Amino acid sequence: MASPKHFLDLSAVGPQDLRTILDDARARKVATKAGTAEKPLAGKMLAMIFEKPSTRTRVSFDVGMRQLGGETLFLSGTEMQLGRAETIGDTAKVLSRYVDAIMIRTTDHSRLLELAEHATVPVINGLTDDTHPCQIMADIMTFEEHRGPVKGKTIAWTGDGNNVLHSFVEGSARFGYRMTMAVPMGSEPHDKFMNWARNNGGEIALYHDADKAVAGADCVVTDTWVSMNQEHKARGHNIFQPYQVNEALMAKAQKDALFMHCLPAHRGEEVTDAVIDGPQSVVFDEAENRLHAQKSVIAWCMGVI
Protein backbone atom coordinates (compact mmCIF):
# COMPACT_ATOMS: atom_id res chain seq x y z
CA MET A 1 0.00 0.00 0.00
CA ALA A 2 1.34 3.42 -0.96
CA SER A 3 1.98 5.88 1.84
CA PRO A 4 -0.76 8.51 2.26
CA LYS A 5 -0.07 12.09 1.17
CA HIS A 6 -0.24 14.15 4.33
CA PHE A 7 -0.34 17.96 4.55
CA LEU A 8 1.43 18.58 7.84
CA ASP A 9 3.69 21.59 7.26
CA LEU A 10 4.99 23.66 4.35
CA SER A 11 8.43 22.23 5.07
CA ALA A 12 7.06 18.71 4.45
CA VAL A 13 5.60 19.48 1.01
CA GLY A 14 7.77 20.36 -1.97
CA PRO A 15 7.52 23.77 -3.68
CA GLN A 16 6.21 22.26 -6.92
CA ASP A 17 3.38 20.49 -5.08
CA LEU A 18 2.53 23.67 -3.16
CA ARG A 19 2.34 25.58 -6.43
CA THR A 20 0.15 22.84 -7.93
CA ILE A 21 -2.23 23.22 -4.98
CA LEU A 22 -2.41 27.01 -5.39
CA ASP A 23 -2.97 26.79 -9.14
CA ASP A 24 -5.77 24.32 -8.52
CA ALA A 25 -7.27 26.56 -5.82
CA ARG A 26 -7.49 29.49 -8.21
CA ALA A 27 -9.18 27.32 -10.83
CA ARG A 28 -11.63 25.85 -8.31
CA LYS A 29 -12.54 29.32 -7.04
CA VAL A 30 -13.39 30.46 -10.57
CA ALA A 31 -15.36 27.28 -11.27
CA THR A 32 -17.26 27.52 -7.98
CA LYS A 33 -18.36 31.08 -8.70
CA ALA A 34 -19.34 30.10 -12.25
CA GLY A 35 -21.32 27.11 -11.05
CA THR A 36 -19.18 24.70 -13.08
CA ALA A 37 -17.08 23.13 -10.31
CA GLU A 38 -16.59 19.37 -10.46
CA LYS A 39 -17.23 17.12 -7.46
CA PRO A 40 -14.33 14.64 -7.57
CA LEU A 41 -14.77 13.39 -4.00
CA ALA A 42 -18.34 12.09 -4.17
CA GLY A 43 -18.76 9.30 -1.63
CA LYS A 44 -15.67 10.33 0.36
CA MET A 45 -15.64 11.23 4.07
CA LEU A 46 -13.39 13.72 5.89
CA ALA A 47 -13.13 13.40 9.67
CA MET A 48 -12.56 16.75 11.38
CA ILE A 49 -11.02 16.56 14.85
CA PHE A 50 -11.21 19.79 16.87
CA GLU A 51 -9.27 19.84 20.12
CA LYS A 52 -9.10 23.61 19.67
CA PRO A 53 -12.36 25.41 18.75
CA SER A 54 -12.69 27.41 15.55
CA THR A 55 -15.19 29.13 13.31
CA ARG A 56 -13.28 29.62 10.07
CA THR A 57 -11.50 26.27 10.10
CA ARG A 58 -14.61 24.22 10.79
CA VAL A 59 -16.85 26.04 8.33
CA SER A 60 -14.26 26.26 5.54
CA PHE A 61 -13.30 22.57 5.72
CA ASP A 62 -16.94 21.48 6.03
CA VAL A 63 -18.18 23.61 3.14
CA GLY A 64 -15.07 22.83 1.10
CA MET A 65 -15.46 19.06 1.41
CA ARG A 66 -19.14 19.36 0.47
CA GLN A 67 -18.28 21.48 -2.57
CA LEU A 68 -15.91 18.68 -3.60
CA GLY A 69 -18.82 16.26 -3.39
CA GLY A 70 -17.85 14.59 -0.12
CA GLU A 71 -19.10 14.64 3.44
CA THR A 72 -17.61 15.52 6.83
CA LEU A 73 -17.72 14.08 10.33
CA PHE A 74 -17.16 16.50 13.22
CA LEU A 75 -15.35 15.10 16.28
CA SER A 76 -14.73 17.35 19.29
CA GLY A 77 -11.77 17.03 21.62
CA THR A 78 -14.00 15.85 24.45
CA GLU A 79 -15.43 13.11 22.25
CA MET A 80 -12.04 11.93 21.02
CA GLN A 81 -9.89 12.15 24.18
CA LEU A 82 -6.82 11.57 22.03
CA GLY A 83 -4.08 9.73 23.88
CA ARG A 84 -6.14 9.35 27.06
CA ALA A 85 -8.70 6.55 26.75
CA GLU A 86 -6.91 5.12 23.70
CA THR A 87 -3.50 5.69 22.16
CA ILE A 88 -3.32 8.16 19.31
CA GLY A 89 -1.86 5.41 17.15
CA ASP A 90 -4.84 3.14 17.74
CA THR A 91 -7.27 5.99 17.10
CA ALA A 92 -5.51 6.75 13.81
CA LYS A 93 -5.73 3.13 12.70
CA VAL A 94 -9.42 2.87 13.57
CA LEU A 95 -10.40 6.16 11.93
CA SER A 96 -8.49 5.10 8.81
CA ARG A 97 -10.93 2.18 8.46
CA TYR A 98 -13.94 4.52 8.59
CA VAL A 99 -12.98 7.69 6.71
CA ASP A 100 -10.95 8.74 3.68
CA ALA A 101 -8.98 11.62 5.25
CA ILE A 102 -8.50 13.27 8.64
CA MET A 103 -8.12 16.96 9.48
CA ILE A 104 -7.03 17.85 13.00
CA ARG A 105 -6.87 21.19 14.83
CA THR A 106 -4.95 20.63 18.04
CA THR A 107 -3.04 22.44 20.76
CA ASP A 108 -0.18 19.91 20.56
CA HIS A 109 1.83 19.51 17.34
CA SER A 110 3.10 16.11 18.47
CA ARG A 111 -0.47 14.77 18.32
CA LEU A 112 -0.66 15.72 14.65
CA LEU A 113 2.62 13.95 13.91
CA GLU A 114 1.65 10.83 15.83
CA LEU A 115 -1.73 10.70 14.11
CA ALA A 116 -0.04 10.94 10.71
CA GLU A 117 2.55 8.31 11.63
CA HIS A 118 -0.13 5.69 12.23
CA ALA A 119 -2.93 6.72 9.85
CA THR A 120 -3.30 4.95 6.52
CA VAL A 121 -5.30 7.87 5.09
CA PRO A 122 -4.14 11.47 4.55
CA VAL A 123 -3.85 13.71 7.60
CA ILE A 124 -4.19 17.50 7.25
CA ASN A 125 -2.91 20.10 9.71
CA GLY A 126 -5.86 22.40 10.43
CA LEU A 127 -3.73 24.26 13.01
CA THR A 128 -1.41 23.31 15.85
CA ASP A 129 0.42 25.25 18.53
CA ASP A 130 3.48 25.19 16.23
CA THR A 131 2.19 25.87 12.71
CA HIS A 132 -0.78 26.84 10.54
CA PRO A 133 0.12 25.91 6.94
CA CYS A 134 -3.41 26.12 5.50
CA GLN A 135 -3.57 29.78 6.52
CA ILE A 136 -0.39 30.58 4.62
CA MET A 137 -1.72 28.83 1.51
CA ALA A 138 -4.77 31.10 1.66
CA ASP A 139 -2.59 34.15 2.30
CA ILE A 140 -0.26 33.49 -0.64
CA MET A 141 -3.28 32.87 -2.85
CA THR A 142 -4.74 36.20 -1.70
CA PHE A 143 -1.50 38.11 -2.21
CA GLU A 144 -1.10 36.79 -5.74
CA GLU A 145 -4.71 37.62 -6.63
CA HIS A 146 -4.03 41.26 -5.76
CA ARG A 147 -0.34 41.76 -6.55
CA GLY A 148 0.86 38.94 -8.80
CA PRO A 149 3.67 36.46 -8.05
CA VAL A 150 4.88 36.58 -4.46
CA LYS A 151 8.41 35.50 -5.37
CA GLY A 152 10.85 38.32 -4.64
CA LYS A 153 8.32 40.34 -2.64
CA THR A 154 8.64 41.27 1.04
CA ILE A 155 6.12 40.15 3.64
CA ALA A 156 6.44 41.84 7.03
CA TRP A 157 5.11 40.44 10.29
CA THR A 158 4.64 42.43 13.46
CA GLY A 159 3.45 41.06 16.82
CA ASP A 160 3.86 37.70 18.51
CA GLY A 161 6.18 34.97 17.24
CA ASN A 162 3.39 32.41 16.97
CA ASN A 163 2.29 29.43 14.88
CA VAL A 164 1.15 31.52 11.92
CA LEU A 165 4.53 33.25 11.80
CA HIS A 166 6.30 29.88 11.91
CA SER A 167 4.46 28.83 8.76
CA PHE A 168 5.18 32.18 7.09
CA VAL A 169 8.87 31.61 7.86
CA GLU A 170 8.74 28.17 6.24
CA GLY A 171 6.87 29.68 3.31
CA SER A 172 9.74 32.07 2.60
CA ALA A 173 11.84 29.08 1.55
CA ARG A 174 9.01 27.42 -0.36
CA PHE A 175 7.63 30.45 -2.26
CA GLY A 176 10.70 32.68 -2.52
CA TYR A 177 9.50 35.80 -0.70
CA ARG A 178 11.53 37.78 1.82
CA MET A 179 10.17 37.52 5.37
CA THR A 180 10.82 40.32 7.83
CA MET A 181 9.60 40.08 11.42
CA ALA A 182 9.28 42.43 14.37
CA VAL A 183 8.47 40.87 17.74
CA PRO A 184 9.07 41.86 21.38
CA MET A 185 12.08 40.44 23.19
CA GLY A 186 11.17 36.99 24.45
CA SER A 187 8.45 36.44 21.84
CA GLU A 188 10.71 35.38 18.99
CA PRO A 189 9.75 32.52 16.64
CA HIS A 190 11.30 29.15 17.45
CA ASP A 191 14.84 28.63 16.20
CA LYS A 192 13.95 25.35 14.46
CA PHE A 193 11.72 27.17 11.97
CA MET A 194 14.20 29.98 11.44
CA ASN A 195 17.08 27.57 10.93
CA TRP A 196 15.09 25.37 8.56
CA ALA A 197 14.16 28.37 6.42
CA ARG A 198 17.73 29.66 6.25
CA ASN A 199 19.06 26.20 5.40
CA ASN A 200 16.53 25.84 2.59
CA GLY A 201 17.01 29.15 0.83
CA GLY A 202 14.62 31.36 2.77
CA GLU A 203 15.48 35.04 3.18
CA ILE A 204 14.42 36.09 6.66
CA ALA A 205 15.22 38.99 8.97
CA LEU A 206 14.26 39.40 12.63
CA TYR A 207 13.91 42.77 14.37
CA HIS A 208 12.54 44.15 17.60
CA ASP A 209 11.49 47.35 15.84
CA ALA A 210 8.27 47.33 13.81
CA ASP A 211 9.32 50.29 11.66
CA LYS A 212 12.41 48.40 10.47
CA ALA A 213 10.49 45.23 9.64
CA VAL A 214 7.73 47.02 7.76
CA ALA A 215 9.92 49.47 5.82
CA GLY A 216 9.30 48.94 2.10
CA ALA A 217 7.20 45.80 2.61
CA ASP A 218 4.68 44.65 0.03
CA CYS A 219 2.42 43.11 2.65
CA VAL A 220 2.01 43.66 6.40
CA VAL A 221 0.65 40.83 8.53
CA THR A 222 -0.29 40.55 12.18
CA ASP A 223 -2.30 38.29 14.47
CA THR A 224 -3.77 38.38 17.96
CA TRP A 225 -1.19 39.16 20.62
CA VAL A 226 -2.20 36.16 22.74
CA SER A 227 -3.46 33.04 20.99
CA MET A 228 -6.49 31.05 22.12
CA ASN A 229 -5.66 28.68 25.00
CA GLN A 230 -2.34 30.50 25.52
CA GLU A 231 -3.57 33.28 27.79
CA HIS A 232 -1.08 32.07 30.40
CA LYS A 233 1.66 33.44 28.15
CA ALA A 234 0.37 36.98 28.35
CA ARG A 235 2.90 39.28 29.96
CA GLY A 236 0.85 42.41 29.56
CA HIS A 237 -0.29 43.87 26.27
CA ASN A 238 1.97 46.86 26.85
CA ILE A 239 4.94 44.94 25.45
CA PHE A 240 3.07 44.50 22.16
CA GLN A 241 1.74 48.05 21.83
CA PRO A 242 4.72 49.26 19.75
CA TYR A 243 3.87 46.47 17.27
CA GLN A 244 0.29 47.56 16.60
CA VAL A 245 -0.54 47.93 12.92
CA ASN A 246 -1.92 51.44 12.51
CA GLU A 247 -1.92 54.02 9.74
CA ALA A 248 1.48 55.37 10.79
CA LEU A 249 3.06 51.91 10.57
CA MET A 250 1.39 51.10 7.24
CA ALA A 251 2.85 54.34 5.88
CA LYS A 252 6.32 52.79 6.30
CA ALA A 253 5.45 50.02 3.82
CA GLN A 254 4.98 50.34 0.06
CA LYS A 255 2.13 52.66 -0.89
CA ASP A 256 0.18 49.74 -2.31
CA ALA A 257 1.08 47.31 0.49
CA LEU A 258 -1.62 44.86 1.51
CA PHE A 259 -2.73 44.28 5.09
CA MET A 260 -3.49 40.74 6.25
CA HIS A 261 -4.83 39.17 9.43
CA CYS A 262 -6.05 35.57 9.78
CA LEU A 263 -8.90 36.66 12.08
CA PRO A 264 -10.51 36.89 14.54
CA ALA A 265 -9.04 40.34 15.17
CA HIS A 266 -8.95 42.20 18.45
CA ARG A 267 -9.66 45.64 17.04
CA GLY A 268 -7.82 48.39 18.85
CA GLU A 269 -5.11 46.00 20.01
CA GLU A 270 -2.97 44.44 17.25
CA VAL A 271 -4.69 46.49 14.52
CA THR A 272 -6.74 49.66 14.37
CA ASP A 273 -10.16 49.96 12.74
CA ALA A 274 -8.72 52.41 10.21
CA VAL A 275 -6.34 49.75 8.87
CA ILE A 276 -8.48 46.62 9.00
CA ASP A 277 -11.42 48.46 7.41
CA GLY A 278 -9.20 50.48 5.07
CA PRO A 279 -8.50 50.11 1.34
CA GLN A 280 -5.28 48.11 1.85
CA SER A 281 -6.97 45.42 3.93
CA VAL A 282 -7.70 42.04 2.30
CA VAL A 283 -8.65 40.16 5.47
CA PHE A 284 -12.02 38.98 4.17
CA ASP A 285 -10.47 37.83 0.90
CA GLU A 286 -8.09 35.78 3.04
CA ALA A 287 -11.00 34.28 4.94
CA GLU A 288 -12.76 33.34 1.70
CA ASN A 289 -9.60 31.86 0.25
CA ARG A 290 -9.25 29.50 3.21
CA LEU A 291 -12.20 27.69 1.62
CA HIS A 292 -10.66 27.39 -1.83
CA ALA A 293 -7.08 26.71 -0.75
CA GLN A 294 -8.19 23.98 1.63
CA LYS A 295 -10.35 22.36 -1.04
CA SER A 296 -7.23 21.97 -3.13
CA VAL A 297 -5.21 20.73 -0.15
CA ILE A 298 -7.84 18.02 0.35
CA ALA A 299 -7.89 17.22 -3.37
CA TRP A 300 -4.08 16.97 -3.48
CA CYS A 301 -3.97 14.72 -0.43
CA MET A 302 -6.62 12.46 -1.94
CA GLY A 303 -4.92 12.23 -5.31
CA VAL A 304 -7.41 13.99 -7.55
CA ILE A 305 -4.98 16.71 -8.66
Curated annotation (Swiss-Prot):
GO terms for biological process: arginine biosynthetic process via ornithine; citrulline biosynthetic process; L-arginine biosynthetic process. Pathway: Amino-acid biosynthesis; L-arginine biosynthesis; L-arginine from L-ornithine and carbamoyl phosphate: step 1/3. Its EC number is 2.1.3.3. Carbamoyl phosphate binds at residues 54-57, 81, 105, 132-135, 262-263, 290. This is Ornithine carbamoyltransferase. L-ornithine binds at residues 163, 223, 227-228. GO terms for cellular component: cytoplasm. Keywords: Amino-acid biosynthesis, Arginine biosynthesis, Cytoplasm, Transferase. InterPro entries: Asp/Orn_carbamoyltranf_P-bd, Asp/Orn_carbamoylTrfase, Asp/Orn_carbamoylTrfase_sf, Asp_carbamoyltransf_Asp/Orn-bd, Orn/put_carbamltrans, OTCase_ArgI. Its main location: cytoplasm. Transmembrane segments: none annotated. GO terms for molecular function: amino acid binding; ornithine carbamoyltransferase activity. It comes from the Bacteria. Reversibly catalyzes the transfer of the carbamoyl group from carbamoyl phosphate (CP) to the N(epsilon) atom of ornithine (ORN) to produce L-citrulline. It catalyses: carbamoyl phosphate + L-ornithine = L-citrulline + phosphate + H(+). It is found in: Cytoplasm. It comes from Agrobacterium fabrum (strain C58 / ATCC 33970). It is an enzyme of class 2 (transferase). NCBIfam families: orni_carb_tr (TIGR00658), PRK00779.1 (NF001986). The gene is argF. The keyword Ligase does not apply. It holds the Pfam family OTCace_N. Belongs to the aspartate/ornithine carbamoyltransferase superfamily. OTCase family.
